[in-house]
Amino acid sequence: MSQSDTIFDYKHIWHPYSSMNNPHPCYTVISAKGVYLKLKNRKYMIDGMSSWWAAIHGYNHPVLNKALKKQIRKMSHVMFGGITHPPAISLCRKLISLTPEKLDCVFLSDSGSVAIEVAIKMLIQYWQALGQKRKLFLTIRNGYHGDTFSAMSVSDPKNSFHQIYHNLLPKHLFADAPVSSFYKNWDNEDILSFKKIIEKNSFKIAGVILEPIVQGVGGMNFYHPMYLKQIKILCNHYSIPVIFDEIATGFGRTGKMFAFEHANVVPDILCLGKSITGGTITLAATLTSRHIADTISKGKVGCFMHGPTYMGNPLACAVANANIKILKTNQWKIQVLNIEKQLFKSLMPLINHPYVTDVRVLGAIGVVECSRSINMISIQKFFVENGVWIRPFKKLIYIVPPYIISPHTLKKLTNVISNALNKTELFI
């Protein structure tokens, strides 16, 4: 890669959450293997982010690569309208087998945000088919569900990612976020805000949507499983369907295959993405019950009105099948448990640091919440120079490493975080 390529990128390519007038530096990765990203200067970085939660088995995994190569010899893509193919059928079988018995209808899409859009549209059509024009959704503060319009509308409007669009988005209902954390005692007052809203608006609410147990970039909070149980009880009482957004947490990240298993509850609609293909290629899925699917199909329109061009892409489905095969045959639960134990041991002592207000660990997720805002450019440079890739935001330094990371390599990640806290110039 030449210097002119770098200059071209700087001038013409818009990266996520970046300015074209004053873009943050981008670091050129030329290859990746295992937990390592190789830079153009031939140096290596330990990936602490799994490419935004996705690469759970690391990079260049032979089983995933083999699945891609085998499929591409047959076909890389074919439209899914009026056509089906073995990789999609096999994947949907596996997803139905992995998830609770109730979820037996699968809609495939090409990104997590689209999976959320699909879930929301499903419930709007569901109520239309029942003769009710419900379009209001209830969710909780500090939530994040993606960057497309419907996904933004059910994300916390106080979230700085979406504030600029607030007046343009559909208005929904937001209950207070739970205060009871995952490992602390349950406080029954946590459910009161949600209960009050659902009691007052039950006849208008099309559905409830939330991230089970782990709230992602809305604040990286881990809330008590009892909150999820109480929500499901209330929703069942008022016959309001529940959407669980497991796009970030699905496929083992919290120590369970799906985060909702911590509460022993089942959603009416489940959204999956990110690590569904082991971080190899983009794919997402929205699963729902036969009842919801049949109700939509019996409505005035007679079908569900959605169909992405790359829906059910054979390459993506093939590698997703391989990813699930790995999860069924390897020791991912032990891997995640070992990561969790080490993160507790390495990160929890940082709670005594003057720049730290909280430390949170669950499964293969570690979060250090700082008392001061982070200087993104400075801290990113510090991390890269120290051989790790960590992408903080706001006041949060968090890691979600690949499950295959070794104890020695994970220790380096956490040591660099600890060292960063001692650099005052990295904070604002």
UniProtKB/Swiss-Prot annotation:
Family membership: Belongs to the class-III pyridoxal-phosphate-dependent aminotransferase family. BioA subfamily.
Amino-acid positions noted as binding substrate in the UniProt annotation, renumbered to this chain: 52, 144, 274, 307, 391
Binding annotation for pyridoxal 5'-phosphate: 112-113, 245, 308-309
Role description: Catalyzes the transfer of the alpha-amino group from S-adenosyl-L-methionine (SAM) to 7-keto-8-aminopelargonic acid (KAPA) to form 7,8-diaminopelargonic acid (DAPA). It is the only aminotransferase known to utilize SAM as an amino donor.
Enzyme class: transferase
Lineage of origin: Bacteria, Pseudomonadati, Pseudomonadota, Gammaproteobacteria, Enterobacterales
Domain of life: Bacteria
NCBIfam families linked to this entry: bioA, PRK05964.1, PRK07986.1
Cellular component per GO, a single term: cytoplasm
The gene coding this protein: bioA
UniProt keyword list: Aminotransferase, Biotin biosynthesis, Cytoplasm, Pyridoxal phosphate, S-adenosyl-L-methionine, Transferase
Pathway: Cofactor biosynthesis; biotin biosynthesis; 7,8-diaminononanoate from 8-amino-7-oxononanoate (SAM route): step 1/1
Cofactor(s) in the UniProt record: pyridoxal 5'-phosphate
Chain positions of site Participates in the substrate recognition with KAPA and in a stacking interaction with the adenine ring of SAM: 17
PROSITE patterns reported in the protein's UniProt record: AA_TRANSFER_CLASS_3 (PS00600)
Protein name (record): Adenosylmethionine-8-amino-7-oxononanoate aminotransferase
Name of a matching Pfam family: Aminotran_3
